[in-house]
Amino acid sequence: MEAKAVIYAILDFDGEKTARLVRAHLDQGADAREILDQILIAAMDEVGRQFSSDIFFVPEMLMAAEAMQAGLEVLMPYLARSEIRAKGTVVIGTVRGDIHDIGKNLAAMMLECAGYNVIDLGVDVSKGKFLAAAKKHQAHIVALSALLTTTLTEMEAAVSDVRARAGGTLKTLVGGAPVTASFAAEIGADGYSPDAAGAVAIARNLTEAVSK
């Protein structure tokens, strides 16, 4: 049975078929970790590429992530939880004063599907809560989202707080409609992504930097 069949099922948003094919791979002796890394995560990478190319949009990304989740649920009994979350821990939230969560939720889902342990703090999150959660969960990355231009100062304050109190051991990733690459660089963020799909690739780079 080819891995492509599972990937196509995810790209077709067919969770039932995805789960059935993953189960068939396991029955044939396939390694659960390899199914996760080489099939399910590879499928979400392709979803990210199609989103970046304007082939998929937010609804398609959500449906693909749900299909992937159906396959992941089949794998769960075959994988220790620590193995599934081996890529790192990300604390994510929308900064204080901003209650918009669509972009943040999508980024959280994409990161989780890519194998990260995601601690979602929700919206209107103060800089202190970001840092406290990061320390509590021994996070590798703090991801901050903002939709309102008026809350960019809160994002800057939170990034500065992480840099001042956590040093280089904790990376920051920022994004949201009013956020630009130049603004991210200006406030000292370690990573910037213009969309949820790109957040996964940036997170990988940041976690690799931390582990070196």
Stretches found by the model and what they are:
Residues T18, T94, T149-T151:
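Ser/Thr-centric signal marking residues that sit
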Residues R85-L121:
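Glycine-rich active-site/cofactor-binding loop and its immediate structural neighborhood
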Residues I41, R96-D98, P178:
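Short glycine-enriched loops at secondary-structure junctions
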Residues M1-E83:
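Long amphipathic alpha-helical segments
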Residues R85-A86, T207-K212:
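Non-catalytic signal-transmission and effector/linker regions of two-component phosphorelay proteins
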Residues A107-A114, I119-A189, D195-R204, E208:
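Cofactor-cradling patches in redox/metallo enzymes
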Residues F57, I99-H100, T151:
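Alpha-helix N-cap/loop-to-helix initiation residues
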